[in-house]
Amino acid sequence: MKLDYEFFQRDAVSVAKDLIGKLLVRNLNGEELICRIVDTEAYCGPEDKGCHAYQNKRTNRTEVMYKSGGYVYVYLIYGLHYCFNVVVSKQDRPEAVFIRAGEPISGLKTMRDNRNIKSNKKTELTNGPGKLSQAMAIDKSLNGQDLVASKEIYLRHACDSQSYQIIPAKRVNIDYAEEYTDKLWRFYIRDNPFVSIN
């Protein structure tokens, strides 16, 4: 079952934690590529010095963050890697959850082709934000997509009822965020080999 607007229209920390174990589905040329989300980070609006919308800096890039929760926010880093985020919270409250890594469930051959790697090491496919986006064919063309209405990309509950030990941690590579550097707003599954970094 797809996640609904009610799920997304909550604060980023709650959604980031609750997205662990959910499935990211990308429909690509009639094939479903599916990853279980194993690693997330919350970015908590204008007060959060690590957030793109810190001090309500509203730009063309961040405009989608001001929508109500349930939209895709994709941006490029280092001119190379696309980063996939989920807009959360209420209209005009710019919060997002960054999806750092996933565990491939379905469509592994296509993911491998998308990543252009020969290695059969499954963990190499999606164990980081750039790798995940490349494997799942996530790019700027998906920016602003409605995750509830879209058939191209969406999030859903997993059919299994696995339980996970979720570890809270500091977010990665935001040393500039001063007191927000130490917030435990990253969540990942303990001992999962697809987590980006431990």
UniProtKB/Swiss-Prot annotation:
GO molecular function: alkylbase DNA N-glycosylase activity; DNA binding
Alphabetized UniProt keyword annotations: DNA damage, DNA repair, Hydrolase
E.C. designation(s): 3.2.2.-
Pfam families named among the record's database cross-references: Pur_DNA_glyco
Disulfide bonds: none
SUPFAM superfamilies recorded: FMT C-terminal domain-like
Enzyme class: hydrolase
Domain of life: Bacteria
One of the GO BP terms on file: base-excision repair
Family classification: Belongs to the DNA glycosylase MPG family.
Protein name per its UniProtKB record: Putative 3-methyladenine DNA glycosylase
